[in-house]
């Protein structure tokens, strides 16, 4: 066994190796034109939609491998991630390779992080923390918009948060598409539970009102336990989805985002100037510049 492989197995034995990666997992080697990697053969997330994501390592830097089936998505995720490479708040694509069946994306690994769904698994967030998370998300989404793309699947699972620094990054660009804000869209690529009501009613939607709707859904769910996640059907049934314990401006933000009539919904460009976010700085500080030392991931 080579020394790099021994080092990687030390990472897998570390309790902070995250999720479903265990010390007994087997390790394989993958080579690209640029680097050679070791990869765990057990997914980071077992079951569900993300059993195609694996922890890996190149020399002394941990990375994440994502396998994208060529049958499902014709390389769009790679194209979008390359175009957004320098965008703050976006998970970075280090490089990619492919085989007969898959595009293999090699993505940066953020230590001490978890997806937002698991972050509020057993707790409802305090309003101030939730507000800062939502403001970061809006700034990141607007940066994506300015580059000419729409993420297409904004939800708790596609946001990771650095537990110590409370900074977030957007992941999973498998549903991302080119911005086409003036034309109706007839295909839905995102998660059905987060679909906007107009798609159910009319069979089409516009990209920006859909984005505002999904932002509102994320905001509601931050104030709930994971098992209580709220979806469109709950709203259409008339159930009260506004948290009682938050400020009036917080309640108004959620109401403005989750208005059934898309023409009365908060505008995409009006998100950042909503009174709920008064006093917050309009900047995104990358996690990688906040003290994360990838060389110290291996102990």
Swiss-Prot record:
EC numbers on record: 2.7.11.1
Residues at the active site: 153 (proton acceptor)
Protein name (Swiss-Prot/TrEMBL): Serine/threonine-protein kinase 1
Catalytic activity: L-seryl-[protein] + ATP = O-phospho-L-seryl-[protein] + ADP + H(+); L-threonyl-[protein] + ATP = O-phospho-L-threonyl-[protein] + ADP + H(+)
UniProt xrefs under Gene3D superfamilies: Transferase(Phosphotransferase) domain 1
Sorted UniProt keywords: ATP-binding, Host cytoplasm, Kinase, Nucleotide-binding, Serine/threonine-protein kinase, Transferase, Virion
Residues where ATP binds: 45-53, 66
Family per record: Belongs to the protein kinase superfamily. Ser/Thr protein kinase family.
Organism: African swine fever virus (isolate Pig/Kenya/KEN-50/1950)
Enzyme class: transferase
Recorded superkingdom: Viruses
Function per UniProt: Essential for viral replication. It may mediate the virus progression through DNA replication.
Location relative to the cell: Virion; Host cytoplasm
Domain Protein kinase, residue spans: 39-277
GO CC terms in record: host cell cytoplasm; virion component
Classification via PROSITE patterns: PROTEIN_KINASE_DOM, PROTEIN_KINASE_ST
Phylogenetic lineage: Viruses, Varidnaviria, Bamfordvirae, Nucleocytoviricota, Pokkesviricetes
Main location: virion
Sample GO molecular function, one term: protein serine kinase activity
């Amino acid at each position: 066994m080579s020394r790099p492989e021994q080092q990687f197995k030390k990472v897998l034995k570390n309790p902070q190796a995250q999720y479903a990666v265990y010390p007994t997992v087997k390790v394989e080697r993958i080579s690209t034109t640029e680097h050679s990697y070791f990869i765990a053969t057990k997914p980071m997330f077992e079951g569900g939609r993300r059993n195609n994501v694996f922890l890996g390592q190149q020399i002394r830097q941990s990375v994440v491998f994502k396998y994208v089936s060529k049958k499902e998505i014709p390389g769009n995720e790679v194209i979008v991630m390359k175009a957004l490479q320098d965008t703050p708040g976006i998970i970075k694509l280090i490089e990619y390779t492919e085989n007969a069946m898959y595009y293999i994306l090699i993505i940066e690994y953020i230590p001490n992080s978890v997806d937002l769904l698991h972050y509020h698994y057993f707790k409802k967030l305090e309003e101030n923390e939730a507000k800062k998370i939502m403001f970061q998300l809006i700034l990141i989404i607007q940066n994506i918009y300015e580059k000419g793309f729409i993420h297409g699947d904004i939800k708790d699972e596609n946001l990771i948060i650095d537990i110590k620094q409370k900074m977030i990054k957007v992941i999973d660009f498998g549903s991302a598409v080119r911005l086409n804000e003036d034309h109706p869209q007839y295909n839905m690529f995102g998660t059905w539970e987060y679909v906007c009501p107009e798609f159910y009613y009319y069979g089409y939607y516009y990209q920006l009102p859909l984005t505002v709707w999904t932002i509102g859904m994320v905001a509601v769910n931050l104030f709930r336990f994971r098992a209580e996640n709220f979806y469109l059907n709950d709203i259409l049934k008339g159930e009260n989805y506004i948290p009682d314990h938050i400020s009036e401006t917080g309640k108004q933000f959620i109401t403005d985002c989750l208005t059934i009539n898309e023409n009365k919904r908060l505008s995409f460009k009006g998100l950042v100037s909503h009174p709920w976010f008064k006093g917050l700085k309009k900047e995104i500080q990358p996690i990688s510049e906040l003290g994360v030392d990838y060389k110290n991931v291996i102990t």
